[in-house]
Amino acid sequence: MSGLTLRQLGFENGPLDEFSLPSDLVVSTAVDQPNVVTIVLAGPSPQTVEDHLRATLPNEGFTIDARADAGEALTFEGNGWTGGFTGTGATSAIVLRPV
């Protein structure tokens, strides 16, 4: 499953080469700070983003800690960062924080 890394998306903070998102993403809002990286997506669907994360995070050095039984939500950590993903309707968000 191919995607774009944070570096390819123009971010200066976060696990720049170790974290990716679907290549057809539509960024609605983004925060790029040393202490937090937040990305709100208007597309693709939250299910597509979650599927991408579940398929790529382990290969990128992350461990998925928890996943919601209902709906799109998960937490993960690795490469010196913790992260969370949630989605509802057509919108989803990722938050990354350094450990």
Regions found by a protein language model. Give the residues of each.
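Short, ordered beta-strand-loop transition motifs
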Residues: 29-36, 65-71, 86-90
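Intrinsically disordered, low-complexity, compositionally biased regions/tails
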Residues: 7, 11-18, 65, 82, ...
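Short, exposed beta-strand-loop hairpins at the edges of beta-sheets
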Residues: 73-90, 94-98
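Short Gly/Thr-rich strand-loop-strand
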Residues: 58-82
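Amphipathic alpha-helical segments
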Residues: 44-65
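Second-shell loop/turn segments in exported
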Residues: 36-44
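Generic "edge-of-domain/loop-turn" microfeature
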Residues: 26, 46-48, 69, 81-83, ...
